[in-house]
Amino acid sequence: MTAEYIRDWQQPRHAVGREGTGIPAPESALSSWLDAYRVENERRQEMADAAFSATPLGNLINKSLDAQEKQDKTITLAGDARKQARGAVDEAMASLRLLPSYLRDPLIRHLSFLRKKQEADRRKGKKSWQAERYARGTLRKIFERLDSTDGRWLTPGYRSLAGRERLDDLLYLPQLNKHQIQTLATMTAAMFSSTFEKLCDGFGATDGELTMDVTLKAYQMLARMALHLHAMPPHYDALTTDKDRRNEPDTELLPGAILRLTCAEWWKRKLWLLRCEWREEQLRAACLVSRKTSPYLSQDALSEFRAQREKTRDFLKSFMLENEDGFTIDLETVYYAGVSNPVHRKAEMMATMKGLELLAEARGDKAVFLTITCPSKYHATTENGHPNPKWNGATMRDSSDYLVNTFFAAVRKKLNRDGLRWYGIRTVEPHHDGTVHWHMMVFAHPEEIDTIVSHTRDIAIQEDRHELGNDITPRFKVEYVDGSKGTPTSYIATYIGKNLDSRAVDGIDPKTGKPRVDHETGKSMAESVERAIGWARLHRVRQFQFFGIPSRQVWRELRRLA
């Protein structure tokens, strides 16, 4: 119902300047001045930006901003693609395309395989959800694990230093190749060199003359920067100035430490090792290191190991050594004459082990074979290739540090406190997902060996004891050496051979009549040995360690003289 008005002036009117009336709002003098000021300010800003862009620094910053804008645009487009995805598989595909190629390609291949299999089953009238389950379950967990893994390296200090010094490639270090690492190392060394000069000037260096006090202070600042980049500074323990330090820092080491921190070759090695370790942990988090995919180490790392080994062989074959008398010999012959030759290294290990066996027989000691495994939280992947729900993001180095610094250190402390004597050898092996486990051959007095085994067992299962229940064999296994079955040397020989030289364990299995297969990987012994050696080289793991005996260096020197 419409209200009727007797007079026109009684009807409601719109406010002046409202939309739809066609009556513009009156423009004041102040608004005119503000508009003119804004236009003039924008003109001056454009002129200043154009002048700054013409400088080398401005050009470099603009290129960096353009790259960042391009990346942001890619992320936005990927986000739009996910919103428009028709299902979980399409959404997973859109997310996978954002990953680096070494992560993206194998995951996309597996997802595409599952989708084709699912579509084939559905055409046959079967209910199949393999691709959807993989996309909603496994891939979602993989994305979370990758974020957690990257967070271990992309710390606030790491990000801050990379952004402040314009070393943006540090944020994408796992994706770089050797040439790019070389360029980044040169830029990093130059940054440390210029920072050292600024620090010296700031600490009071006059006329280019440096005192030890000024140099030491500058080194401390550079060392903190290197630690932010996950690189251990040279001679850090000897040059630290902590309050708890009992003696003065060894200043004679300062020149060498500064030269290394400002050397491109030193940074090239450090950054390459960091890149390889970071990249391998990403692949472990993506379940690409397992019995189902690539046991012990990733296929990417295995290819790098094979290429480097071939490069080393070509280098050794290309050079010869000549002494002052004119005698020449191939460099390859000299290289493989020492313990670098796996055959010689195995012979030395077996000779030492046989010596321990003979010593134990003379002393009347008994031998026991132990297997120690890390808790479940250190294992990234289950045997069927699925993400381990108990994994806490621990790296391979974390599992090794647990066995060395937590388990073995606690056992030695306990045995020393109780006055118990043991000696033997420990061998380090990878599980299928790259996690470390130990095999130990222990010799001890017959009256003490049971106590030693008991202490070792209690410490091995102490952490996360609740996950074991009544069965402790997943964490700790013990087998007393039975003379009727073999000697201590024969017990450990297989584990020494399978981590050094496949010829020691290769051949035909007498039980099956077929080539021997490694039960841990399901592959031939030759390939398993190659993968174990590549795993140890990648993570810089000490595969064998004798304990409770004097150093073998004296024996090596006497053998060399003989």
Enumerate the predicted regions with their spans:
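Right-hand nucleic-acid polymerase module
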Residues: 1-434, 446-562
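Short hydrophobic/aromatic beta-strand micro-patches
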Residues: 441-445
